[in-house]
Design a protein with these regions (language model features):
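Conserved ABC ATPase signature
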Residues: 137-141, 145
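ABC ATPase nucleotide-binding domains
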Residues: 232-271
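H-loop/switch region of ABC-family ATPase nucleotide-binding domains
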Residues: 197-198
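Conserved beta-strand-loop-alpha-helix hinge in the C-terminal portion
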Residues: 217-241
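Catalytic Walker B motif of ABC-type/P-loop ATPase nucleotide-binding domains
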Residues: 162-165
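Helix-to-loop junction immediately C-terminal to a conserved catalytic motif
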Residues: 54
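Conserved ABC ATPase "signature" region
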Residues: 115-133
Length: 271
């Protein structure tokens, strides 16, 4: 599935003294089978942008296209099944007596049989390493466990594009690594992932492409290497280290991920 935003503009409180332009003509595509990271400072428009991807917010002007079709012509429920959105701190929306009931809520809205619903629930929980949590109360879980359950509720819809808004915020290192591994697994299974993050190191580890937003506009978009080496001072630690070495050792190339940078350093050590 290809998701496109064309010249999307969004104005909050339009026509009032409090009018604010949050997006100023953003054009961006989410390609099939990719991890696209969206980065930028607080207030740059990241959350506003991703809420247009399944029309939780409707553009003031511009278009959202799903496989070339105007998204406004599609049934909203079907669009939101295909483009799943997980807000920041989604665990605050947990409500059911058990984890299984909570995760099953969304699939049940599509008249699926009980066997199909249960299969999806267990499949999504297992993907997040949380299968054993199914019978437990979500309110008795740790913060990291609650986060996994909340994400599982969206995965149970089997989206073609999964949008994650700051999914690792507040998580312990082990849970964070598990979630980043899940993102890569989803891409391998054919799901595109849009990752909103302030953490450039995690972006470097998983993103195929990076979009930088500044004051509601795209200031850069490209592969992680293209974006980060374009401005190494605003880049993850791996790129900053490599950039310092490239002046005297250009053969180090353009490593972005931690493993790539480590391999380059080992190669230099052995040279």
């Amino acid at each position: 599935m290809k998701l496109e935003l064309r010249d999307v503009r969004h104005v909050y409180a339009r026509g009032t003294p409090f009018e604010v332009e949050a997006l100023g003509g953003v054009s961006l595509a989410v390609e099939p089978n990719e991890v696209l990271a969206i980065v930028g400072g607080t207030g740059s428009g990241k959350s506003t942008l991703v809420q247009h991807m399944n029309l939780l917010l409707v553009p003031t002007s511009g278009e959202v296209l799903v496989d070339g079709v105007d998204a406004t012509t599609l049934e909203r429920s079907e669009l939101r099944r295909r483009v799943g959105l997980v807000f920041q701190f989604p665990e605050s929306a947990l409500f059911a007596p058990t984890v299984e009931e909570d995760v099953s809520f969304a699939p049940r809205q599509f008249a699926l049989g009980e066997e199909e619903v249960r299969e999806r629930v267990l499949e999504s929980l297992r993907a997040l390493g949380a299968g054993e949590l199914a019978p437990r109360s979500p309110f008795a879980l740790s913060g990291g466990e609650k986060r996994r359950v909340a994400i599982a509720g969206v995965l149970a819809m089997r989206p073609e594009v999964l949008v994650l808004d700051e999914p690792t915020a507040g998580l312990d290192p082990a849970t964070r690594e598990d979630l980043l591994a899940l993102i890569l697994d989803l891409r391998e299974s054919g799901v595109s992932v849009v990752l909103v993050s302030h953490d450039l190191d995690e972006v470097a580890e998983v993103a195929d492409r990076v979009c930088v937003l500044h004051e509601g506009r795209v200031s850069a978009v490209g592969t992680a290497a293209e974006v980060f080496y374009g401005d190494p001072t605003q880049a993850p630690a791996t790129v900053r280290v490599a950039s310092l070495l490239r002046g005297s050792r250009p053969e180090i190339g353009d490593p972005v991920r931690f493993g790539e940078t480590l391999d380059a350093l080992r190669a230099l050590q052995g040279a």
